[in-house]
């Protein structure tokens, strides 16, 4: 048996609908499926980019206080074929967005945008 591929990353969210709206508007993710478990007081929504298998799993636990992300988790990354355009779009939508940056001695090739729960997405220029 061998490992085949990455399936999803789970993000716990305070406001499920606001998070879905962010990932749809900011990156074009689409809701793939939703599972509600009222008896266990949580809902899971899987989002995916069209044609991609990797998903973001948004988990909403009913009545939970805002989550503390901590300092161990940094970010998820996504590729862009229009880095400048996406950076401008994210700023125009009012999202917390950094300017385009580069590693020391390198031209700008990435920036960060933050979702409603404080999770950061690194947007990287596609090669």
Feature names for model-found ranges:
Residues 2-4, 32-36, 43-46, 78, ...:
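Vicinal oxygen chelate
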Residues 3, 10-53:
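Core segments of cupin and vicinal oxygen chelate
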Residues 9, 76, 80:
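Hydrophobic adenine-recognition pocket in adenosine-nucleotide-binding enzymes
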Residues 51-54, 63-65, 83-85:
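Short, charged/polar surface micro-motifs in flexible loops or helix N-caps
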Residues 73:
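Flexible, small-/acidic-enriched active-site or ligand-binding loops
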């Amino acid at each position: 048996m061998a490992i085949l591929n990455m399936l999803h990353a789970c993000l716990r969210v305070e406001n499920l609908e606001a998070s879905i709206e962010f990932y749809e508007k900011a990156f074009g993710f689409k809701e793939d499926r939703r599972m509600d478990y009222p008896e266990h007081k949580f809902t899971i929504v899987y989002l995916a980019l069209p044609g991609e298998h990797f998903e973001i799993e948004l988990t909403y636990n009913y009545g939970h206080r805002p989550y503390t992300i901590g300092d161990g988790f940094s970010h998820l990354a996504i590729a862009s074929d229009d880095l400048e355009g996406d950076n401008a779009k994210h700023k125009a939508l009012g999202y917390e967005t950094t300017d385009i940056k580069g590693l020391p001695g390198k031209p700008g090739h990435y920036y960060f945008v933050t979702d409603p729960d404080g999770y950061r997405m690194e947007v990287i220029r596609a090669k």
